[in-house]
Curated annotation (Swiss-Prot):
Keywords: Isomerase, Magnesium, Metal-binding, Phosphoprotein. The modification Phosphoserine is found at residue 118. It catalyses: alpha-D-glucosamine 1-phosphate = D-glucosamine 6-phosphate. HAMAP family: GlmM_B. The gene is glmM. Its EC number is 5.4.2.10. The active site is at residue 118. InterPro entries: A-D-PHexomutase_a/b/a-I (IPR005844), A-D-PHexomutase_a/b/a-I/II/III (IPR016055), A-D-PHexomutase_a/b/a-II (IPR005845), A-D-PHexomutase_a/b/a-III (IPR005846), A-D-PHexomutase_C (IPR005843), A-D-PHexomutase_C_sf (IPR036900), A-D-PHexomutase_CS (IPR016066), Alpha-D-phosphohexomutase_SF (IPR005841). Binds 1 Mg(2+) ion per subunit. This is Phosphoglucosamine mutase. It is an enzyme of class 5 (isomerase). It comes from Acidothermus cellulolyticus (strain ATCC 43068 / DSM 8971 / 11B). One of its GO terms (molecular function) is magnesium ion binding. Catalyzes the conversion of glucosamine-6-phosphate to glucosamine-1-phosphate.
Length: 461
């Protein structure tokens, strides 16, 4: 996967947008170079300064990363860029993305920077900027940063250059914050936790142990190269086997930067983000905390989520795919709970982004509070058979305008009627078109998805 855009010293070709739905990503040291990382940091500092974000005070940024080896040199480049632009920097070290977001707000920082490619393979990395308060930068600010890469700037000197120091206490601050969101003890629960050899490898087991659970950690030994390798939320079969082997009550899986959480019940069956969202929605409704009796989900959520929650008087607002769009809809509508099938669960009472560690604690807390097994809680959502086909190596920009694809899409929707759903969308981070089909039977979903994927490949390949 190649980074798009142009940066001084990088030799990257210009394309419409440098920032994807989750920051700038690419293969580290080929696409996402030290030069680009430094340029992005400098440009971000100056764009925010010119927007008045640093007015009247000395600016402060926090920088955190996942354990990828490439994160070390990218961190050095970002820190150098920020300090050279007059921004003081706290290096947080290896921490989950939601921890960086929390500390951006808790430390009243003007900017947060996360170096991670989340669930992507180890050679990839990414840079994501967070605004004051811990929310992702708005699209227009990201575009302004991209537009001004490599421009000459007035460089501060003397006392006006940024200072840099490590801030290891951030880890404990985040752990205490997560624990403070629940007073429900987890004593008696045996839980397998798979951290994908990623950023949650220390934090997630620590939180659950402090809450009283017996924790069996797997995928918690990062070496810089093994992130997401056979472990984590994108390799859930590893956790399924471990839960069965250990006789655990449940399993929790994170991705590389721990903004996701998927679960596994005692039988080893997956409990996905839709089901987790529904379980928490019922808990919050019961406690009188579910604003407007509504949750926010994406168009990729299973139709079973909407049907299951409707039976309890809970509405679902749908957004485009991406946790940033879920968050935007939550803030605009005054909703407090939202998420994605992939396991991004956002709880605005406690966090500004998806938080896998927090989600795991809240989910297990619901199990402990009700005394019900996870499989029983998850039955609130009857998942319709869902088939997803990723069509790679195609021109994703034409997926919405190709007449043949649109004709086939309309035919598929007519064929399935109210008993199913079809969605085509371009990935925000990869050269991929995703074909999603839900139907009453697996065979129907497979047949329609395969037909649409073939048409997309033929028309856009």
């Amino acid at each position: 996967m190649a980074v798009s855009g142009t940066a001084a010293g990088t030799g990257l070709a210009s394309t419409p947008r440098l920032f994807g739905t989750d920051g700038v990503r690419g293969i580290a040291n080929r696409d996402l170079t030290a030069e680009l990382a430094l340029d992005l940091a400098v440009a971000a500092a100056h764009v925010l300064a010119q927007a008045g974000a640093f007015e009247g005070h000395r600016p402060l940024a926090v920088v955190g990363r996942d354990p990828r080896a490439s994160g070390e040199f990218l961190e050095a480049a970002v820190v150098a860029g920020l300090a050279s632009a007059g921004v003081d920097v706290l290096r947080l070290g290896v921490l989950p993305t939601p921890a960086v977001a929390y500390l951006t707000a808790a430390l009243d920082a003007d900017l947060g920077v996360v170096l991670s490619a989340s669930h992507n393979p180890m050679p990839d990395n990414g840079i994501k900027f967070l605004a004051r308060g811990g929310h992702k930068l708005p699209d227009d600010i990201e575009d302004a940063v991209a537009a001004r890469l490599g421009e000459p700037w007035t460089r501060p000197v003397g006392r006006f250059v940024g200072r840099v120091r490590d801030y290891p206490e951030g880890l404990d601050q985040y752990v205490e914050h997560v624990l403070a969101t629940s007073d429900q003890r987890l004593d008696g629960l045996r839980v397998v936790v798979d951290c994908a050899h990623g950023a949650a490898s220390v934090v997630s087991p620590a939180v659950l142990r402090r809450a009283g659970a017996t924790v069996v950690p797997i995928g918690c030994e990062p070496d810089g190269y093994n992130i997401n390798d056979g472990h984590g939320s994108t390799n859930i079969e590893t956790l399924q086997a471990a839960v069965r082997r250990e006789g655990a009550d449940a399993g929790i899986a994170h991705d590389g930067d721990a903004d996701r959480c998927l679960a596994v019940d005692a039988a080893g069956d997956v409990v996905d983000g839709d089901q987790i969202l529904a379980i928490l929605a019922l808990a919050w409704q019961e406690a009188g905390r579910l604003a407007h009796d509504t949750v926010v989900a994406t168009v990729m959520s299973n139709l079973g989520l909407k049907l299951g929650l409707a039976a309890h008087g809970i509405s679902v607002v749908e957004t485009a795919v991406g946790d940033r769009y879920v968050l935007e809809a939550m803030r605009a509508g005054g909703y407090v709970l939202g998420g994605e099938q992939s396991g991004h669960i956002i709880m605005l009472d406690y966090a500004t982004t998806g938080d896998g560690v927090l989600t795991g604690l809240q989910l297990l807390g619901r199990m402990a509070a009700t005394g019900r097994p996870l499989a029983d809680l998850a039955r609130v959502v009857r998942r319709l058979p869902q088939v997803l086909r990723n069509v790679t190596g195609v021109d994703k920009t034409r997926v919405d305008t190709d007449p043949v694809i649109n004709k086939e899409l309309a035919a598929a929707r007519g064929e399935l009627g109210d008993g199913g759903r079809v969605l085509l969308r371009a990935s925000g981070t990869e050269p991929v078109v995703r074909v999603m089909v839900e139907a009453e039977t697996e065979a129907d979903a497979e047949r329609v998805a395969e037909r649409l994927a073939r048409v997309v490949r033929e028309r856009l390949g």
